Amino acid sequence: MSSATQRFITYAIGKGDQQQLEKVFSTSLQIHALISLVVVILGETIGLWFLYEKLVIPDDRMTAAVWVYQCSILAAIVSIMSVPYNASIVAHEKMSAFAYISILEVSLKLFIVLMLVLSPWDKLITYAVFYFLIQLLIRCIYARYCSKNFPESKYHHVFHYPLLKEMGSFAGWSFWGNLAAILYTDGLNMMLNMFFGPLVNAPRGIAVQ
C-alpha cells in the first residue's frame, strides 16, 4: 500500500487539488486501519493457535515467546498505520525529514540492544517491549511532522468508494508479490522450527540479516 498511497498523493499534489489530497490521505488511513484490524483478528486467532500448538518452543520460554508475539502484533499495527504518513513525506519530497527520522529510529534500536546488557529482566521480553515503544514513538513523530507541515494529513471522515477501489486495485499486484516474499521467508523459518526446533532458527536468523 505504500507505493499506492505515495502515487495517489503525488498525483493529487501535481494537480493542485487540495480536496482530492485530503480524500486520498483519509482513504489511505481507512484502508490501513482495515488491514490492521485483519492483522489483529488473524494474529489473535490463527496466530496464537499456531504459536501454542505447532511451534517448537521450550516450556520455560513460552511466556517470553507470548510477550514477543503480542509486541510484534502491536508493532506491526503501528508500522501499518505509519505508511500514509511515510508516503506523504516522500510524496512531498521532504527527504531530509525522512532521513533524520530514520536515523533516529536506527539509533534508538541500536541503543536498546546495547542496554540489554544492563537489563535485569528477561532480555527477549525487554527487547520486544522496547522495540514496540520505539515504533510507537517514531509513528508519533511522523504524525506530528505531517500534521504540522501538510494540511491534508489530518483525518477527515469521508468514504469515497471509487477511490477506495482504485487504490486497492493499484496496490493489489504489489501486495501479492510482497505476501509471497513474506510467506517464503517466514514460512521457511516456521518449517525449520517445526521440524528441527529453535536451535536451527538462530543461525537461520543470523544468515538472512
Whereabouts are the PLM-identified features?
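Alpha-helical transmembrane segments of multi-pass membrane proteins
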Residues: 45-48, 57-82, 99, 103, ...
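Transmembrane-helix boundary and interhelical linker motifs in polytopic inner-membrane proteins
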Residues: 1-34, 51-57, 85, 90-97
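Small-residue-rich midsections of specific transmembrane alpha-helices
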Residues: 1-13, 28-39, 74-82, 138, ...
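Interhelical loop/hinge segments that connect adjacent transmembrane helices in multipass membrane
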Residues: 124-130, 142-190, 194, 199-200
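Hydrophobic alpha-helical transmembrane segments
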Residues: 70, 99-149, 166-170, 201-209
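Short alpha-helical transmembrane interface motifs in multi-pass membrane proteins
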Residues: 31, 66-71, 94-98, 169-176
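Helix-terminus/linker motif at the lipid-water interface of multi-pass membrane proteins
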Residues: 52-56, 117-120, 182-209
